[in-house]
């Protein structure tokens, strides 16, 4: 009986020790993956109940800073995309409702530099 990861028709599926297919959020060897309703592993942006997540090309959930096409996004330790004002270590940042980091501009009267840091 096949268990673990299975590549079928170009999609990846995860099978339990009993051979049943998993769906939803699954933590495999310390890494989070999202398997859709048919069990296929998802990649790219995922909107779940109004919260955005990013799953990289290997399907693992991204955390921390993410750059896509010259735009930066910040994903929390739980994988959710940040918007509005937030603090990372000792610095403050602002991301628009799209999740895109504000850079070299003024937001709500506060200036952010080219790195998106409030100055």
Q: What role is predicted for each listed range?
A:
Residues 1-119:
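Extracellular adhesion/carbohydrate-binding repeat motifs centered on closely spaced tryptophans
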